[in-house]
């Protein structure tokens, strides 16, 4: 703590043999202000250090809280699926979906017991035992918190006490205080002798002016006062020693009682711990046996499911092979029948084309023969008509030769011949046209006959094709029936395959669930063992901390007892010193020492110590504006009466300018 103090300024004080001056009073006030500033500076440094420690602890606690929250969220995710109650499911879903860490920590802190119960329910462990353990741990934590609070309070009291002691040491080390009280640390006895010698010299000087009787009376009074003071000192020392002896005996008896109580509690705690360990071992052993039995039964079920799965796989493979063989047979038979039908159809088509060509050839020959027959008949008719006309011409020529004289008739005959030729020419033309028409008609009839033959052939081929189509439709219906039957068989096989697949997937899911349950049980066992180890370690750590706290508590109690004893001793010494001062003051007043140097020094002491306004209370508040010191009662009264000016220098001040000091 001395590192935080500022270097003390060097004060220029008057000679201790001389009475106090105004400079000594100002130096005394300045040093009091300096001590107060040092005190507040030390407190500020302590607060800064505590703030740093608390910030580091807060960061660690936030990290640990975030880790605990993440682990709780992971546990909640693993527990949600196995939870049956809808409210618990909603609560766990809300816990999983919350992203803000502050709200998550609030939810977990408000519902810690509920979360523990849910995790323990789903884990399948014994809830009552775990809740009992949690309650024991919570009670232990509460007791530890109470112990920590009490130890912190005691530590605060101890720090305050030590700060007061340091302030006393600072006051003892200060030159101004030693100058005021005439008690310097280095040579107190010498100063007392000097004071006594100076006082005696002053008294002698003054008494030299007076009569010898007054000097003898003064010396006798002073010696009597010194004798009484020594007796009072011895009495105070005796009372202090008696009080210390009483305190020590009481403290000894109290410590013996506490020791016996602690031994009894330690023995009871040991027995309780041994019983708890036996109970925990007896509980863990059946739990381990139950888990082993569960694992063995689950492994057997897993093996049985694997065997069933293998049987289903072999059946599935056989069915798939039979299906492939059946499909191959059907396809081969269908292809063979289709190829034979195609070949038969092609041969029939070839025969039909061949028959049609032969038929066309025969029909053409018949039509040609018929056409040739008609032309020969027409030629014969024409020849007959020509022969008839030639015969008629010959008859006419014979007639003309017989009748030569008939020229006129000849001309008429020639004209008739011309007309006949023209008529014959026209008839020939008509006959040629008629022949052409007949040829066209014959051709058309031939074509008609061909077309009719083709039609009849087509009809015959149509009938054959219809018969073939009927046969093919019958074959197609049979093949369709076969295909439908095959499709039905395929559907049944597919349903069987789907059922086999479903059974296979169910068996695989069951196997996965069994494996996951095995993993979860193993993980839970590992977690429980780790938690058990952690709890054991935490209990050991808490026990060690409690031991350390008990040790520190006993040390602090012993220190507090020592300081109480010292305080009582100091109180007794202060009371004796006050009695001494009162007696000395009375002796001085009775000996007429008001005009002396000692009386003046005491008056200066009173002006330094007591308030100049009321002269009743000690000076304990300084004004920051001017540095003058008064009692807090007078300052508050002046502020209440709106007299907000210093009574010595008339400088204004407010309630914020008041500074508490210790002279």
Swiss-Prot record:
It catalyses: S-ubiquitinyl-[E2 ubiquitin-conjugating enzyme]-L-cysteine + [acceptor protein]-L-lysine = [E2 ubiquitin-conjugating enzyme]-L-cysteine + N(6)-ubiquitinyl-[acceptor protein]-L-lysine. GO terms for cellular component: HULC complex; nucleus. It is found in: Nucleus. Residues 273-285 have a biased composition (Low complexity). Residues 133-172, 225-424, 463-588 form a coiled coil. Pathway: Protein modification; protein ubiquitination. This is E3 ubiquitin-protein ligase BRE1. E3 ubiquitin-protein ligase that mediates monoubiquitination of histone H2B to form H2BK123ub1. H2BK123ub1 gives a specific tag for epigenetic transcriptional activation and is also a prerequisite for H3K4me and H3K79me formation. Keywords: Chromatin regulator, Coiled coil, Metal-binding, Nucleus, Transferase, Ubl conjugation pathway, Zinc, Zinc-finger. PANTHER family: E3 UBIQUITIN-PROTEIN LIGASE BRE1 (PTHR23163:SF0), RING FINGER PROTEIN-RELATED (PTHR23163). The keyword Translocase does not apply. A zinc finger (RING-type) spans 611-650. The keyword Metal-binding applies. The gene is BRE1. InterPro entries: E3_ubiquit_lig_Bre1 (IPR013956), Znf_C3HC4_RING-type (IPR018957), Znf_RING (IPR001841), Znf_RING/FYVE/PHD (IPR013083). It comes from the Eukaryota. It comes from Kluyveromyces lactis (strain ATCC 8585 / CBS 2359 / DSM 70799 / NBRC 1267 / NRRL Y-1140 / WM37) (Yeast). GO terms for biological process: chromatin organization; protein ubiquitination. Belongs to the BRE1 family. Residues 176-225, 273-293 are annotated as: Disordered. It is an enzyme of class 2 (transferase).
